[in-house]
Amino acid sequence: MSLLDFFRSRKSQNSASIAKERLQIIVAHERGQRAQPDYLPQLQKDLLEVIRKYVPIDQEQIQVELENQGNCSILELNITLPDR
């Protein structure tokens, strides 16, 4: 085994562990999105329609997130309002 082989094998193990870590992050993110209730997209659409009655905004300017903390659910609504 030459000195170069030692560094090559070490590098590929390092790349594999990095790839594994990235994949775990992606899987965790996907699982988090599946845990959201089915009504959340419709709720976002309804809220957007109500807000549009008063302020002209696009769909990209409203974010609805549901967060579970223990036995409590928190609905967070972020709206980017246009300047007057």
Swiss-Prot record:
Task: Please report a single Pfam family linked to this protein.
Answer: MinE
Which GO BP terms sit in this record? division septum site selection; regulation of division septum assembly
Per the record, the domain of life is Bacteria
Q: Which UniProt keywords apply?
A: Cell cycle, Cell division
Q: Does the keyword Disulfide bond apply?
A: no
For whether the record's keyword set contains Cell division, the answer is: yes
Cellular component terms per the entry's GO annotation: plasma membrane
Say what the protein does: Prevents the cell division inhibition by proteins MinC and MinD at internal division sites while permitting inhibition at polar sites. This ensures cell division at the proper site by restricting the formation of a division septum at the midpoint of the long axis of the cell.
**Family according to the record:** Belongs to the MinE family.
Sorted alphabetically, which HAMAP family does this protein's record hold?
A: MinE
Instruction: Output the NCBIfam families linked to this UniProt entry.
Output: minE, PRK00296.1, PRK13989.1
The name on file for this protein is Cell division topological specificity factor
Query: What organism does this protein naturally occur in?
Result: Pseudomonas aeruginosa (strain ATCC 15692 / DSM 22644 / CIP 104116 / JCM 14847 / LMG 12228 / 1C / PRS 101 / PAO1)
Upper classification of the source organism reads:
Bacteria, Pseudomonadati, Pseudomonadota, Gammaproteobacteria, Pseudomonadales
UniProt gene name? minE
